[in-house]
Amino acid sequence: MKKIDYNRSIFLDSSSVKEIEKWNATGIIDGVTTNQSIMLKDGLTLKQVIPTIKKICKIMNDKPVSIELTDSTASIEQMVSEAKKYRQIARNIIVKVPMIPSDIKCLNVIKKLGDLKIPVNVTAMMNFEQLVIASLAIRNHPTPSFVSLFWARSIEDQEKYRTSNEFQKNHPILGQLTDVNSHPAKITEGLINFLKSGGYDIPKLIVGSIRNVSQIGQAFAAGANIVTIQPAVLQAMLYSQRTIETNADFDASWQALKKQL
């Protein structure tokens, strides 16, 4: 797999072969992430999933392609078996293991995949503490391995649950919402500091669940190693109305200069 330090990278959050080909040709993306919801949104049928994964891996060559385990209710053995099948498809596949709050099953899966030298991307995390435990679980994994913070969903988690008096009453063991969990930017800063102070090169932090361009800027400014972005939002990074107007001014000036000939 291509040696990239992933200290400041963009991944494409998509399963569209067309979009992945387009953006990979620009040279700005260092990887691809996808999941079942993205595949459904992109119009894939069940029969198209594996062939599409193969195409994506070929397009990305040796850049990482994160593919998610398909059933969080499956047994440890079933999850490990599925992960091994994915790795047989292509060596640049990173297995996405969902954080599962109900028990320690995901930690067992992560450990077994590490023993098999299968790199992972621990996903669906909303708070600092989840990221810490996932980071410790994969600190000795093969590189590249990742942990993923869901930016917009983290905000939803705070607004809908963690700031609710009823939720706090029913889940006293979680404690009050702290400053580090008050915003995904704080979570990002906290996790990057945790990894640096611990001397951990693995994992790298991916920030996903990005809904708009402003969140991309916030995530990188907070220190995210990687931001994974949907094609439409990535395209919107190029936009500024003043840039459009400035280009029009320059074009008009050139046409005026040509008239002097």
List where the protein language model places each region:
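Catalytic alpha/beta core domains of metabolic enzymes, predominantly
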Residues: P101-K111, P119-V233, Y239-K258
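Active-site beta->alpha loop and helix N-cap motifs at the rims of alpha/beta catalytic domains
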Residues: K2-E21, A25-I29, T34-K112, L116, ...
